[in-house]
Each structure stands twice: as C-alpha cells, then as structure tokens.
Amino acid sequence: MSNPNTSSSESPMVTGLFRDRESAERAYESVSARGYGRDEVNLLMSDETRKTHFSGDASEVTSELGSKAAEGAGIGGAIGGTVGAIAAALAAVGTSIAIPGLGLIVAGPLAAALAGAGAGGLTGGLVGALVGWGIPEERVIRYEKGIKEGGIVMGVKSRTAEDATHFESEWKRNRGEDVYQ
C-alpha cells in the first residue's frame, strides 16, 4: 500500500516527453503549483530546441523557462526578458550544462550528477544517469529519439506518491508522451 507521505527516496521519478513548448510549460506549471522549486526539475532538450523555443522573442512574456534554457546554453541569466517558465527554470538552477558534442542542454539535479561524471563521460553518462534514476533503458531510448526530434524531456523526483500520481495525470492531460512514474 502506498503512503502519500513517503520520502522522496521512496517516491518515484516522474518523467515525460513533450513535443512542444506549450505542453512542456503547462507540465512545468503543474510541478510549480505543487510547491516544487526550479532546482527540483530535470529538463533535457537539444540546443536546437532551446534556440527554437526559448531564444527571446520580444513579443513573448518574460518567464522562468526561457531564462533557464539560456543559462543551460551557457549564455547567462535573462535573455531579453522574453520566455516561458521552463526557460526561467533553466536559468535559475545552479547546475545546468550544455554538452556541445551532443547539442544537448541538461538542467536540474541530473546536471549535477553528469557534471560529477566529468566531461569525458557525459555521452554515456546521460543514458547511465537516466537508467540509474530508475528509468528503463527502452524508455531512455524513446526519450533520446524525442529529444533529437525537438522534444523536451522533463523529470521530477516526487516528494510523495500523491504528487507522482498528480504529475502523471496532469502531464498526460497536457499532451505528454511516455509519461511514467
């Protein structure tokens, strides 16, 4: 029987793939609404996706997502004051890394784990880190394919089983693919 007050070490990592910025933003907002901070959200996307969706269109409203994407790309904090919640989250997280050879942006606790692996181990380290977080290898392969196709992978280590169920439901409702806990 699941106890909704279990610690995060016993609660699942919820992961999902989002094919567009709008669905990723809504999923991120569902996490934020439950009191999770930007440093608790793992985001993986290609550098091309970051440039396409979070590069600072002056017609957009400032948001957390765009700034976080900018920092993940190594270009600093706010980017012209114009992006979404995920981008600001990318910028606000203390640890985010750009992997130039792979064209990949990683932010959140996962970035810290990868940074600890050292630059030489990042390529294999990403798959290993995701598998190490309890994500089955076949799902990691689907996520990798989705990232290459312009998607955004989000992951959150839930604090409670109730939170995990809530995130899974909300992310699926917001067009998340391969959403699991």
Predicted feature locations:
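Cytosol/matrix-facing juxtamembrane amphipathic
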Residues: S2-L65, L114-Q181
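Small-residue-rich hydrophobic membrane-insertion segments
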Residues: T62-R142
